[in-house]
Amino acid sequence: MSPEDFDRLQSLMTSRAGFRLTRDRMKLAEHRLGPVARREGFETVDAMLEALWAKPVASLGWAVIETLLNPETWFRRDRVSFDTFGKELLPALSRARGGQPIKVWSAGCSTGQEAWSLAIAAQEAGIAVEIVATDLSQRALEKARSGAYTGFEIQRGLKAETMLRWFDQAEDAWIARAELRAMVHFARANLCDAPTDSHRFDIIFCRHVLSDVEPARR
């Protein structure tokens, strides 16, 4: 990948997604784009980028962007945040709202572990919540909606008793149970877009997201 192509990738990421792509990630970007190029029918990353610059195609552009986003996440990441959510915030809000469901937004939910962790915390607190979990990546959302995780993914952050209580094993996957699924709605959203009147929540989780966003758009 040439420095010029990387500069254009930086502009693409910033203009469409608001994310910054720093120069030290150039080799990583080229490595990640290899499978995308092959999937899209190109022999090389350079050939794919040349085609993209010549005729910008929305689907190809988003495929490139999604591949360069950081999907890193796991269950109950930063455990203290979820303990505070379940043991302090939810009870206080529930009392203030007279038992009405608490509306929660998981912004930048990636592959869903944060949203399911919030649902588990609410279930264990015995408090009704409605969780909207959004992300820019369609591929990440597909996995999130499936609620299916590998043994490694499910054990990364969850104790065995929690895993067995809230997930069913199906061959090599662990799948979120119906009680959790009823609480979470996944949708695609760009955090850089202006919010609508429907975006009204009692609690917003937006964690490990803004560090990758252009400072001017945070």
PLM region spans:
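Conserved AdoMet
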Residues: 1-105
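Short strand->helix junction
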Residues: 19, 74-75, 111, 194, ...
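Residues at alpha-helix caps and immediate loop-helix transition turns in enzyme cores, especially N-
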Residues: 25, 81, 114-117, 197, ...
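Conserved hydrophobic residues forming the short capping helix/wall of the S-adenosyl-L-methionine
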Residues: 37, 93-94, 122, 148-149, ...
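Short, well-ordered alpha-helices that flank and scaffold nucleotide-derived cofactor binding pockets
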Residues: 87, 91, 120-124, 146
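Extended basic-aromatic, gly/pro-enriched interface segments that bind polyanionic ligands
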Residues: 107, 129-205, 209-217
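Conserved SAM-binding loop of SAM-dependent methyltransferases across substrates and taxa
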Residues: 111-127
